[in-house]
């Protein structure tokens, strides 16, 4: 059993260790961005805290190893090597860069990169060979360290630059690079991502005519290809929080989009679209998306919801790729059912692969190793703690739910973040806001209806507002009972029962003071005026009428002054008034418009009827017969030439009725068909009608 003094000393050492680590915690990087001037590191508020790898000016892709805390990146301008590893140290300005793989056909043009923590493999896409490759990173790092130690003779070689650099050995005949898959010639590989929980690879093809998103097994077997509504996709990432994919596209012309789909590359959604942007890479963290824009040299942050606004978190040196250090797999996915088994295997492998320095420390200095509280796991590669769900801090000493929810119960979500189930009277991320605060407007009083203590997301209608004596109504006392235009000529007030009432100005009346007091007040032509003091309407009546509103005819009071029914109306009116007959005036220039209009309509109708009859009779009247042929009477064979008679009918219209044989009054009684038949028969008959004709010329010629 430990003594109290030793136990107290142990806790003191632990407390001092936590205090000493405070500066480290404050300066830990949360995001890394590749630029034309190396790699930049930022804190959680996107403030620049450090930079590294300044001599590498064309970094095309990089990936993060959560177990070793290393950054692997590819530089396309280095004359000899393509793949590098960066050891970032928060407390040291000298960030060690290790050269891993030399330039070759397999590493010439690396465009995308991803790291698999379970199998400890680094994957990348290479444009020149149109292939996906991987390398076992632990074996590569081990061979690199061995070769460097053999070449230098000692590990304490002095650094000659800002970053210390360790070179890898010359490439051997057996390359550690392994081929995963090769795409078709009309494909151009771009981004690469890994779903470590479900063991899938995703890569993008940005060739214009065959653009697509490919999902494949870890051995390169293609599972499905998504081509619909995909054009020039670039960076791609896996969101383990929501089990979705996110990628960026450069659309036709000036357009760009941020796209999303499920892990089977279905259910595609466009989260954002716009103009004049050149997106290159994308990363996710919690509820936000971050993507780089090489057109304006900016990094944007936006929510994962569609059409969410974006804000600029960085503007500077041509950012190309971005990584968010969220310890997503090891810390935040232990509550994810799809990732729990993978995370447990990763942690087991991590414990079984302790560095030699740690093994030596365990042998020589037992009891002085780093201790993680609350069943946390020590990562001996980085000398940090991987905490159990519900705990955090450098040594897992912080209970994430301790005093987190002000009015409610705390639970740990699948992203290893605390969540609050609020009591029915409170809301907010930490249940720190009363739901009645500011709910009722204009002085209304808020109260909760009876219900259970628990409250679901849909149960929002359990609070009501009491708007008594406020002059307002509505669910939140937002509607004024007395609107600005309720009383037209007066003042509005609320009476008991929440009903609006009007106090009218002098000279107005009505429920809403809408009527002038003198309007239609005086009858029978009386003149209305308002009293100067009482503002009560008064009537000035003519000679024939009397009464308060000129409603009593004076002549009736003179006639029925003894009638009790009339006495109440005629009281006060003189009984000696003469019997007056009502005056009737006539307008001298008046006329009966009805008679005039009726006569006018009758005249017009008769004229129209007459015109119609004339037109119809004219159309029904048969036309006169007309002869259009030239008639010649040929000489008779039995007659001598001197006795022949010849008549030529040229124009019957030039003859009068008595002279021409073309006109016969009897023909008018016949129809056109009979008239034509008679005419033809008469022409064919030589004797015909001409036997009835008188002698031609001077009468000397006679017909025989």
From Swiss-Prot:
Disulfide bonds join 372-385, 387-396, 436-446, 440-465, 467-477, 518-528, 522-539, 541-550. SUPFAM superfamilies: EGF/Laminin, YWTD domain. Residues 1-26 form the signal peptide. The keyword Transmembrane helix applies. The chain crosses the membrane at residues 595-615. Gene3D superfamilies: Laminin, TolB, C-terminal domain. Keywords: Cell membrane, Differentiation, Disulfide bond, EGF-like domain, Glycoprotein, Membrane, Oogenesis, Repeat, Signal, Spermatogenesis, Transmembrane, Transmembrane helix. InterPro entries: 6-blade_b-propeller_TolB-like (IPR011042), Cueball_EGF_LRP_Nidogen (IPR050778), EGF-like_dom (IPR000742), LDLR_classB_rpt (IPR000033). It is found in: Cell membrane. Residues 27-594 are extracellular. Its main location: membrane. LDL-receptor class B repeats lie at residues 69-119, 120-166, 199-242, 243-288. One of its GO terms (biological process) is oogenesis. Residues 363-397, 432-478, 514-551 form the EGF-like domain. Residues 616-704 are cytoplasmic. Has a role in spermatogenesis and oogenesis. Belongs to the cueball family. This is Protein cueball. The lineage of its organism: Eukaryota, Metazoa, Ecdysozoa, Arthropoda, Hexapoda. The gene is cue.
């Amino acid at each position: 059993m430990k003594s109290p003094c030793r136990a107290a000393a142990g806790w003191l050492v632990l407390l001092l260790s936590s205090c000493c680590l405070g500066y480290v915690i404050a300066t830990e990087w949360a995001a890394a961005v590749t630029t034309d001037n190396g790699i930049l590191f930022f804190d959680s508020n996107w403030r620049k805290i450090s930079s590294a790898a300044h001599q590498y000016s064309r970094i095309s892709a990089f990936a993060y190893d959560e177990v070793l805390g290393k950054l692997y990146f590819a530089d396309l301008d280095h004359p000899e090597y393509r793949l590098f590893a960066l050891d970032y140290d928060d407390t040291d300005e000298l960030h060690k860069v290790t050269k891993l793989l030399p330039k070759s056909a397999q590493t010439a043009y690396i465009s995308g990169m991803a790291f698999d923590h379970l199998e400890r493999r680094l994957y990348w896409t290479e444009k020149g060979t149109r292939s996906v490759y991987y390398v076992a990173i632990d074996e590569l790092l081990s061979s690199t360290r061995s070769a460097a130690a053999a070449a230098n003779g000692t590990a304490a070689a002095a650094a000659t630059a800002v970053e210390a650099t360790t070179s890898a050995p010359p490439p051997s005949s057996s390359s550690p690079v392994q081929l995963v898959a090769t795409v078709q010639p009309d494909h151009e590989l771009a981004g690469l991502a890994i779903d470590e929980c479900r063991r899938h690879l995703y890569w993008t093809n940005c060739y214009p005519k065959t653009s697509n998103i490919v999902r494949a097994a870890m051995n390169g077997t293609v599972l499905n290809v998504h081509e619909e509504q995909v054009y020039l996709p670039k960076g791609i990432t896996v969101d383990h929080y929501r089990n979705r994919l996110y990628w960026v596209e450069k659309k036709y012309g000036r357009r760009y989009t941020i796209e999303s789909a499920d892990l089977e590359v279905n259910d595609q959604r466009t989260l954002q679209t716009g103009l004049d942007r050149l997106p290159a890479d994308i990363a996710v963290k919690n509820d936000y998306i971050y993507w780089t824009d090489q057109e304006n040299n900016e990094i944007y942050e936006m929510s994962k919801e569609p059409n969410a606004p974006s804000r600029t978190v960085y503007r500077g040196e041509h950012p190309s790729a971005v990584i968010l250090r969220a310890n997503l797999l090891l810390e935040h996915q232990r509550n994810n059912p799809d990732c729990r088994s993978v995370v447990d295997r990763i942690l087991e492998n991590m414990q079984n692969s302790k560095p030699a320095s740690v093994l030596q420390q365990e042998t020589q200095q037992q009891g002085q190793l780093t201790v993680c509280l609350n069943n946390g796991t020590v990562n001996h590669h980085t000398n940090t703690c991987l905490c159990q769900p519900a705990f955090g801090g450098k040594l897992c000493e912080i209970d994430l739910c301790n005093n987190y929810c002000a009015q409610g119960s705390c639970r740990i979500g699948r992203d290893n973040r605390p969540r609050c189930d609020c009591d029915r009277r409170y809301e907010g991320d930490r249940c720190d806001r009363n739901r009645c605060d500011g709910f009722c407007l204009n002085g209304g009083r808020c109260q909760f209806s009876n219900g259970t203590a628990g409250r679901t997301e849909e149960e929002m209608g359990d609070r009501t507002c009491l708007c008594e004596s406020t002059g307002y109504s509505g669910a939140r006392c937002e509607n004024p009972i007395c609107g600005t235009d309720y009383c037209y000529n007066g003042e509005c007030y609320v009476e008991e029962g929440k009903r609006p009432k009007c106090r009218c100005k002098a000279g107005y009346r009505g429920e809403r003071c809408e009527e002038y007091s003198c309007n239609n007040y005086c009858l029978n032509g009386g003149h209305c005026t308002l009293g100067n003091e009482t503002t009560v309407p008064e009537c000035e009546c003519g000679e024939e009428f009397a009464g308060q509103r000129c409603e009593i005819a004076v002549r009736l009071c003179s006639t029925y002054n003894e009638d009790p029914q009339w006495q109440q109306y005629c009281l006060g009116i003189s009984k000696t008034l003469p019997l007056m007959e009502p005056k009737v005036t006539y307008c001298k220039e008046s006329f009966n418009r009805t008679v005039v209009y009726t006569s006018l309509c009758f005249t017009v109708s008769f004229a129209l009827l007459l015109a119609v009859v004339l037109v119809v009779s004219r159309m029904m009247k048969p036309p006169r017969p007309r002869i259009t042929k030239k008639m010649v009477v040929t000489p008779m064979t039995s007659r001598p030439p001197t006795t022949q008679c010849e008549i030529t009918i040229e124009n019957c219209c030039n003859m009068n009725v008595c002279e021409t044989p073309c006109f016969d009054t009897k023909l008018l009684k016949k129809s056109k068909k009979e008239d034509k038949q008679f005419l033809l028969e008469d022409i064919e008959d030589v004797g015909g009608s001409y036997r009835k004709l008188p002698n031609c010329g001077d009468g000397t010629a006679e017909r025989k």
